[in-house]
Amino acid sequence: MSDTQEYSIKPFDANLINPREDNFNTVGGSKIVVIGKAGTGKSTLIRYLLFLKRSIIPVGMVVSGTEDSNCFYSDIFPPLFIHDEYDEEIIKKFIKRQKYANEHISENPWAVLLLDDCTEDKKIFSSKWQQSLFKNGRHWKLLYILSLQHATDIPPAIRTNVDGVFIFRETNENNLKNIYLNYAGVIPKFEIFKAYMTQVTGDYTALYIDNSAQDNGEWYEHVYYWKVPQMDTRDMKFGCHEYIEFGKQRYNEKYSKN
């Protein structure tokens, strides 16, 4: 019997990631990491996860390093709230907004912050703003999604505060070991992790490690797999009506940073 036959894992359920419809008033924020090379399906998974959370989270901010070339998120987010380059000032203002919302917007202060392949400079994770997002973000009703191509881009002090990680196909043995050591230690043996990665990932399917569970169940009860369905992006608008209208009214299509 193979290791993957002995330890059966279940399909991923988006309710594993806060907020949910039944708890957004009571739970704190979540920090999710998505790891995979270009073309493995990271952005498609993120987009669908946001689609599933669209009725719970009213606003969001996106920083995508490839947005200027593929306009991937412009179909679902108002362009006003999409940036194609990482800027510390964006993060600073976003945190300020969330602190204010958490204090003054009692109905639903939740927001999503997405950084997708825009963090080539590892030094940004040493900034006090990134440290705050990972260490204090749970107090700000914030879903923080960080998409990376390399597992060790973020320092160990931050990795320990990650609530969940999606891992896409990786065939390089050294890279697999890095991912296992830094994110998948809940699985008792590297050989078991490697077997799951071989069997489950590929064809745009990810392994998910849930670090947020409070129970002492078996390790395989916290490991899942997920392949998102194909959807028409026209059906995937994100954000509440006020957020979308605000974006329309204040967006200048002719604006250029150059």
Swiss-Prot record:
SUPFAM superfamilies: P-loop containing nucleoside triphosphate hydrolases. ATP binds at residues 36-43. InterPro entries: P-loop_NTPase. Keywords: ATP-binding, Nucleotide-binding. It comes from the Viruses. One of its GO terms (molecular function) is ATP binding. Belongs to the IIV-6 075L family. This is Uncharacterized protein 075L. It comes from Invertebrate iridescent virus 6 (IIV-6). The lineage of its organism: Viruses, Varidnaviria, Bamfordvirae, Nucleocytoviricota, Megaviricetes.
